[in-house]
Amino acid sequence: MPLLRPAEVLGPVGRLLNKSTATTHGALAVVTGAGSGIGAAFAVELGRRGGAVVCSDVDEIAAHKTAAMLTERGAKAIAIRCDVSRVDDVCSLAEQSQSWFDAAPTLVINNAGVGAGGAPIGEVPLDDWKWVLGVNLWGPIHGCHVFTPILRAAEPSRSPRGIINVASAAAFAAAPGMAAYNVSKAGVLSLSETLAAELSGTAIKVTVLCPTFVKTNIVESGRISEQSSALAAKLMRWTGFSAAKVARVCLDAHDRGDLYCLPQLDAKIGWNVKRLAPGTYTRAVGRISRTTLP
């Protein structure tokens, strides 16, 4: 039996809500978390596609490095510091971006994220919960809250427009020892589905990216146990997907009007197995829990 595409599993809504023309070529784009990893890869690829890119990151030096990389390659780019967990920062990002573009953005990518894991529920420090949810969930909430009205109000000449929210296969995988991260990404998935429904019939497309392991620095910069960090590093090497490839696949999916983007085979398999055989999936995850958690 062939694997089902995410839109087929959940019905035709994924495509019906999003059908439009290309958004990622020549975009006026705002990318959060653009200082490294998938965010930097998004910025570089958008620059290659002729876009002007606002590279935003809480690490201002990293944001400037990405922007400099783009300008060296002939693209237009600027760096702006932004802590996405703070709505005032996101409002300032929107204001500065529009001033630099001299127009409303045509594409917003809510990518900034952090990682935490390695302990079961009840042992994860509440400060870690607040930190992860503050960046991973409240960041996209702030981004959608601030930028959606701006995209709605943009002139028709600026259509099509789009929002890409970066979630993770953790949104549906329920991997043990990663509760805070899982919950944050499940929230981003639901946020994206709701936003797509609300924007149905407009020129604004929504795509949610749900990758598995990608070669980024999220393990080094996160609050993750030594055992879990070693496992994650091994899986990142095994997946074979670079951040650049994930960014390209996601931007192409967005141009097609796909609501869901699961770039890797293991993400697609996990998506399908959980929906076609949820009991089997949960038992398998339980076995993994007994072998990976202390």
Regions found by a protein language model. Give the residues of each.
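SDR active-site lid
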Residues: G201-L265
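The beta1-alpha1 cofactor-binding region of Rossmann-like NAD(H)/NADP(H)-dependent oxidoreductases
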Residues: E60-I61, R81-S92, L126
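Conserved glycine-rich Rossmann-like NAD(P)H-binding loop of the short-chain dehydrogenase/reductase
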Residues: G51-K65
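Conserved glycine-rich cofactor-binding loop
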Residues: L28, G35-S36
